[in-house]
Amino acid sequence: GSVVAYCLGITAIEPLKYGLLFERFLNPDRISLPDIDVDFDDEGRAKTLAYVREKYGADHVAQITTFGSMAAKMAIKDVARVLELPIDESNRLAGLVPAKPGTTLEKAFQESEELKNELENGSILIKKVLNMARKLEGSIRNTGIHACGVIIGPDDISNYVPVADSKDSDMMATQFEGKLIESVGMIKMDFLGLSNLSIIKDACENILKSTKIEVEPEKIPLDDKLTLELFQKGLTMGTFQFESDGMKQHLQNLKPDKFEDLIAMNALYRPGPMQYIPNFIDRKHGREEIVYEFPIMEKYLSETYGITVYQEQVMQLSQALAGFTPGEADKLRKAMGKKQIKVMEELREKFINGCAANNYDQAKVEKIWEDWKKFAEYAFNKSHSTCYAYVAFQTAYLKAHYPAEYMSSVLTHNLSDQKKITIYTEECK
């Protein structure tokens, strides 16, 4: 969602063409600073880090420290080890904590009768372990380095944040974590390594060697007939994001005939929105009627056949129906994405009142909001889906036009995964 990033060649996706909203990246109402994610092939990421250090100076660049905290099970095990509780007892107690992500010890004592019984009726040592673990839970346990986060300062980083030498790298590391770094005005850059970009790069080198044809991935036509046929037939094993059995089945039913269909499928094929894939397919092929609550909604939902698929569509509709500013629309998008219930309730009143001021039927408006609340559970942004579909199309194009050279690269980059090697070898046959 940035014209500047497009013009500089940081991204090859033209935001205006695909309706990507700038307000997701920058807007006057945004409180937090944006961060910038850039994907490189594996070799390119290392080169970029070296380039940044050389260009700006080693003392201007730093990786970002992360802090690992004691979760419920680890708190029990750590305290048990220090208090010399036998390891089998330690593992037994930790095993009584429900396996649900984010479960605290307080919740565990409420949900697990066995664990609660140990707290109330266990041995003196077990009670001591559990009570101390309860106090220590959430404490910082260790430090690490953010997998891809880097900050670049206008001068010596230590003028802004405390730094330390990194034990695993020759780059400095901040002693503040990401949120604190943002509070002093530093912007985080994420330099990500994506193996599929390495596969594309090596496949293009294979093609050049065997055919003398130089393929430039950024110039691959996104309406290429042979590539779209490959998607329509579900022959996407070895491609980016579209190789699962479920996705292949949906592609055969959808028969995508334009790049935008692939963007939508990438967003829909996730827990939650998957339930709407049959409706999406039936509406595309005219087997199900496309219904809009208000005529104005067609402008924003026609590309997804009347189904709200992207966060950006909610942003656009909130502006069109209720008169939200672009900044307010992004605030709604963020509240949905991060499940900020309190913020959503505040915006609900503004949305209802704004729609009423524009003479929209309240019952229908209430229904739209309730649909959006459900949508918040799985909301995905179009900017990400477009980028993923773009890389997926490049991989599919190479497979469709140069199968030997492409699959050779796929196999080379999966040599350590016996299961994938078996699957991809079978695909090559």
Give the positions of each predicted feature.
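Noncatalytic, beta-rich nucleic-acid-contacting surfaces in large DNA/RNA-processing enzymes
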Residues: 1-429
